[in-house]
Amino acid sequence: MASPLSPSAWLAENPMQSDEQLYVVMGSASEAKPFAAWQTVAGAKPPQPVWAGTPYAGWNEVMPYVGVVEPGSAFLDWVANTRAVDWGWLAVSSCPQEVVLNHLKGLTQVYLPEDQPVFLRFWDGTQFLPMLQHLGDGAARMLPVFQRYLINGQSLAVSPCPLAATKPSPWWRVPVPLLAHLAQQSPQVLIDNLLQWLQEQRPDLYTAFSPAILQYKVAYFVRRPGIGHAELADYLAAQLS
């Protein structure tokens, strides 16, 4: 695996064009507190909350943000030095910030193959980078506003596609092969999605176990073939009988 790239090295390898801007997408849920770091060192126009104007506008503790970063900003030094891998990422786009914001807002929730909506942690590089890598150029159909990414020191380029109109969340459907790939690469992604589904759709099962026991049981469940919501519900119900 190539050595991690710093933001300055990445920008030197991929110089920005005159019509491009450098964006940061970050999540408040990270213990690294990237928003606080921005407030300390950036001192420029504040990033915008992605979920503003949605039913989740008050979820400040887990709010994702998007902002424009100047190439010489001290915030990029913070990015280079942080050890966190879930804080967010950098990307280059020729789109205005409002367009970028609306496309990210459209990914607030996505559909799993069984038509169940779940939140997408698009700001979390540990989840989003494997998705982009597996989708390849197809990632542009999910998020067409970005051409180049730097996520946890890894550079990724996506072939551009025509900029589609923004759509209200949820609209994007997670392909079955991608879900299987994520389960192989990082079972925790699948575990988190299943736990979220239980919390939203089957609170009776979600609250029937302590959090640690439920995590263990779901982690055990995902080892088997034929993973699905109905199968998980049957498995947990059998554990209670």
Give names to the regions the model predicted.
Residues 1-241:
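Terminal low-complexity "docking" segments
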